[in-house]
Amino acid sequence: MRILFMGTPDIAAECLKALYAAGHEICGVYTRRDKPVGRKQVLTAPPVKEVALEHGTPVFQPRTLRDGSEDANIRALAPDLIVVVAYGCILPKSVLEAPKYGCINLHVSLLPKYRGSAPVQWAVLNGDTETGVSIMQMDEGLDTGDVLVCEKIAIGPEETSGELFDRVTAVGARVLCEAVPAMEAGTLKPQPQQHENATLAPMLDKELAEFRLTDTAAHIHNWVRGMNPWPMAWFATAGGKKVKVTECRVAASDGEAPGTVLSTKPLTVACADGAVQLLHVVPEGKKPMDGTSFAAGLRLKAGDTL
């Protein structure tokens, strides 16, 4: 089966590697354009492009597919199937209908839950105990196509989005490689999504990453896990300083007011319904440190307000 692959970030690169390793014929790769990265704004290729070039596969980086400018090229590549993993461009009807087997997409949630760009993060932010991966037959909607395959994945109670994403990537690559031959054999049974149960997983940003010590312990704990590694959960101290929290644990309190320091070893602070241990933090303008060192730097003691 001739596969045209479309994807951009690390998860897509891992899936492309898996397809190569499984012996599939990749007739071409579409990815987003190179972009400036870092403080020096070095023009950097997407991870998928690097993998494709290592295998000598033609790479295409159009600004868009929606204007029809790539239709002729896609037809010339003559793919039997288009595989999409976090490409970042909308596929028009002309592209969706070009291959014999259409287009399939790996989505890292149990559809119809968490449609959108940040499904792994929102599963953690919401305190879910499981998520999964879905292989979907693409249509013109946003993650609305029939589900061909899905597999559940448990979420650890202390697992961060970054840690979970690594596991989801590995499972997704495996499930994708299993789905391709099954699709060719005609053994997959499309299951329409229950659209009335759909939820969205919008992009994260630094403003959304804020929590308050007046929030519940569970909310703070989930926010810290879900916003790690980016954009990192943060709160503002009583003095107005921004503090990122990279690791915390839920703890008990005796009903002290939110923001009250209960202990400095480890740094434990009361919140709405209990307390949280702030184990690792990044104070504004400073390097990462453990919570105890942060407390020492501020000369905090039990009973103070953070």
Predicted feature descriptions by range:
Residues M1-R39:
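N-terminal Rossmann-like dinucleotide-binding module
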Residues R2-L4, E25-Y30, H55-L77, I82, ...:
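Internal alpha/beta domain cores that form substrate/cofactor-binding pockets in large enzymes
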Residues G7, V29, A52, I82, ...:
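A residue-level signal for conserved active-site and pocket-lining positions in enzyme catalytic cores
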Residues A13, V42-A45, D67-D71, S117:
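Structural motif corresponding to alpha-helix initiation and N-cap regions
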Residues A22, R32, L81-L200:
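Donor/substrate-binding cores of folate-linked one-carbon enzymes
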Residues K35-H55:
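N-terminal beta-loop-helix "entrance" segment that forms/cooperates
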Residues E178-T237:
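Active-site-lining helix/loop region of Rossmann-like oxidoreductase modules
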Residues L213-L306:
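An anion-binding loop in the catalytic cleft
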